[in-house]
């Protein structure tokens, strides 16, 4: 399964493509999409068209994107949300299933703790994917999102398969969590 991870940003959007075979993760590609110093619609157009180009080049089977966090500055949060929306539009236009993860979930999946620093994420992404060099922060975050999905997708499919049995015991799966 080929997974495209996206770390959205209005100025710089990171992308990372990995392939999962069983428990093995293989690096395919990563990079950044830099938007021009232009008005908002032009920046969103660049994100939409560039993510579409990445999809056309690498043909992922599914995609994962980082959720927006609420920033101290509400305007920044809104702008980030619009950049994220442009990326999601490109993904769904290509008929990809899109999973969403918080930064906390990504850091836990990659580093093992939710309060990890960016440098720790970069280091672990390099180690997990056996990269020769340290990836840039935006590309590392995007690869981290893809790694998170590679691990989470397996767990969710196992829970989904167990859903009928869990229901008989008065339990159910909600948002990827087991609840009573």
From Swiss-Prot:
Transmembrane segments: none annotated. It catalyses: Endonucleolytic cleavage at a junction such as a reciprocal single-stranded crossover between two homologous DNA duplexes (Holliday junction). Binds 2 Mg(2+) ion per subunit. The RuvA-RuvB-RuvC complex processes Holliday junction (HJ) DNA during genetic recombination and DNA repair. Endonuclease that resolves HJ intermediates. Cleaves cruciform DNA by making single-stranded nicks across the HJ at symmetrical positions within the homologous arms, yielding a 5'-phosphate and a 3'-hydroxyl group; requires a central core of homology in the junction. The consensus cleavage sequence is 5'-(A/T)TT(C/G)-3'. Cleavage occurs on the 3'-side of the TT dinucleotide at the point of strand exchange. One of its GO terms (cellular component) is cytoplasm. It is an enzyme of class 3 (hydrolase). The keyword Cytoplasm applies. The active site is at residues 7, 66, 138. Its EC number is 3.1.21.10. SUPFAM superfamilies: Ribonuclease H-like (SSF53098). Keywords: Cytoplasm, DNA damage, DNA recombination, DNA repair, DNA-binding, Endonuclease, Hydrolase, Magnesium, Metal-binding, Nuclease. One of its GO terms (biological process) is DNA repair. This is Crossover junction endodeoxyribonuclease RuvC. It is found in: Cytoplasm. Mg(2+) 2 binds at residue 66. Homodimer which binds Holliday junction (HJ) DNA. The HJ becomes 2-fold symmetrical on binding to RuvC with unstacked arms; it has a different conformation from HJ DNA in complex with RuvA. In the full resolvosome a probable DNA-RuvA(4)-RuvB(12)-RuvC(2) complex forms which resolves the HJ. It holds the Pfam family RuvC. PROSITE patterns: RUVC. Mg(2+) 1 binds at residues 7, 138. Coiled coil: none annotated. Belongs to the RuvC family. GO terms for molecular function: crossover junction DNA endonuclease activity; DNA binding; magnesium ion binding. It comes from the Bacteria. Its cofactor is Mg(2+).
């Amino acid at each position: 399964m080929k997974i495209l991870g996206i770390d959205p940003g209005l100025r710089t959007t990171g992308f990372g493509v990995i392939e999962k075979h069983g428990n093995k993760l293989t690096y395919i590609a990563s990079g950044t999409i830099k938007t021009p110093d232009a008005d908002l619609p032009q920046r969103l157009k660049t994100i939409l068209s560039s993510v579409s180009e990445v999809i056309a080049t690498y043909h992922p089977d599914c995609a994962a994107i980082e959720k927006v966090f609420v920033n101290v500055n509400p305007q920044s949060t809104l702008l980030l949300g619009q950049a994220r929306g442009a990326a999601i539009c490109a993904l769904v236009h290509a008929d990809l299933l899109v999973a969403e993860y918080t930064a906390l979930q990504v850091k836990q999946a990659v580093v093992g703790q939710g309060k990890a620093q960016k440098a720790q994420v970069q280091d672990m992404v390099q180690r997990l994917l056996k990269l020769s060099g340290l990836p840039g922060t935006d590309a590392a975050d995007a690869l981290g999102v893809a790694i998170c999905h590679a691990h989470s997708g397996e767990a969710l499919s196992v829970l989904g398969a167990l859903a009928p049995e869990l229901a008989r015991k008065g339990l159910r799966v909600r948002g990827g969590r087991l609840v009573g």
